[in-house]
Amino acid sequence: SITKIKAREILD
């Protein structure tokens, strides 16, 4: 799912 990837790059 792309949502998880987006969340990851935000909190990275």
Swiss-Prot record:
Top EC class per UniProt? Answer: lyase
Q: Name one GO biological process term.
A: glycolytic process
Q: Which UniProt keywords apply?
A: Allergen, Cytoplasm, Glycolysis, Lyase, Magnesium, Metal-binding
EC number of the protein = 4.2.1.11
From the record, give the transmembrane residue ranges. Answer: none
- Keyword check for RNA-binding: no
Location in the cell: Cytoplasm
Pathway field of the UniProt record reads: Carbohydrate degradation; glycolysis; pyruvate from D-glyceraldehyde 3-phosphate: step 4/5
Cofactor details (free text):
Mg(2+) is required for catalysis and for stabilizing the dimer.
Look up the record and name the cofactor or cofactors this protein needs: Mg(2+)
- Provide the catalytic activity annotation: (2R)-2-phosphoglycerate = phosphoenolpyruvate + H2O
Could you name the domain of life of the organism this protein comes from? Eukaryota
The keyword Lyase belongs to this UniProt entry's keyword annotation? yes
Main location group? cytoplasm
Q: Which GO terms describe its molecular function?
A: metal ion binding; phosphopyruvate hydratase activity
Q: Which GO terms describe its cellular component?
A: cytoplasm
As for what it does, the entry says: Glycolytic enzyme that catalyzes the conversion of 2-phosphoglycerate to phosphoenolpyruvate.
Complex formation: Dimer.
Q: Which family does it belong to?
A: Belongs to the enolase family.
Name listed for the protein in its UniProt record: Beta-enolase
Q: Which gene encodes it?
A: ENO3
